Amino acid sequence: MNKFRTTMVAVAAAAALVGLTACGGSSSSASAPVEGDWDAVVAAAKEEGSVMLYSSQKPANLDALTAAFEAKYPGIDMEYVRGTDSEINPRVETENRTGTGIADVHMTTDASWIENAAESGKFSTELVGPDLDAPAFDPAASVINDRFFLTSAAVFGLGWNTAAVPDGVSTPQDLIDPKFQGKIGIVNPTGFASYVDLYKYYAKNFGEDYWNKIAELSPRVYPSALAVAQALTSGEVTVSPMVQPLVTEVAAGAPVDWALPDKPWGTPWYSEVLSASQHPNAAQVLANFMVTAEGQQALNGGYAAVLPDVEGAVARAQDIASPDIAELTPEKVEQYSQEWQTLFQG
């Protein structure tokens, strides 16, 4: 099976749908995993032969997860579609409504969506993997309604191009400097609950007028933190107050570096096994693998991991507080998005 990995979720999902149709896939939602022990689920997963993940995680980490999963389960091909939460979540809803599941496992940071979906149980099936009950995973603190499980957490900090800013920066306030006019990279939060929370957090912790001062420096706006990291690497911008730890980029020799401020902002990813999955057993196997030591090391270089002592992780995901969803209702996200557009795009 040919793999595809892209940030263009609509294109990728369409391609997957064509492939599913060509293989004679059913248009109705699949059943629950087989009855029996975990070995029976794994055997059934190998019979299904493939699994699809929708995620807003970093492509390099999703590539690493794919390689690690396929090494552990060579009989199961893993594919993923990478997109933002605002792209992926509506597709999950559509696939659930139509019963034509493309995704098998869904990984998102949208706290409001997670809470509502976990409460309704509409989109997911109960988890059965043994590692989701492991004491090191701390299921009491990591699983919501036996449907959503903590998988990772993004921690945001400061990033800079080492050629342009050899001394780096250490606080978000360091970016408020005329020398960075037109060279600051920021993420457009429009429609993204997580990024709206980030902007509000910075204003609360680094000054209510922080973003007004940044706006005066004519920052360059990007659709995601990944795009900001790429712009830092190319030198299109020289600093950013909002990047995920640039561990992968530094390891690859890119001219960038990063640091966490004293009060870094973070947001957790939760995942679910989708009820519209056409590969219900493979979905459970992938979900379980994601919380094993191998899965966590692959997925969380530069991120917070759900297990202790994971090489490459920068924090423990259980220590990253979830956003206050009362402040992230669709109405409040829309209101803040409009305020942001007025400030930065006038």
Report the location of each language-model feature.
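C-terminal motif of bacterial Sec signal peptides marking the signal peptidase cleavage site
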Residues: V18-A22
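Bacterial signal peptide processing site
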Residues: G24-S26
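Extracytoplasmic ligand-binding site segments that recognize negatively charged/polar headgroups
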Residues: M52-T66, M78-N96, T100-E236
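A ligand-binding cleft/hinge motif common to bilobed small-molecule-binding domains
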Residues: S112-N116, V237-D257
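Periplasmic-binding protein-like
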Residues: A153-A154, F180-T190, K213-A215, V221-Y222, A252-S277, F289-G312
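A bilobed periplasmic-binding-protein/Venus flytrap-type ligand-binding module shared by bacterial periplasmic
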Residues: G157-A164, Y199-K200, T267-A282, F289, ...
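Extracellular/periplasmic bilobal clamshell ligand-binding domains
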Residues: A313-G346
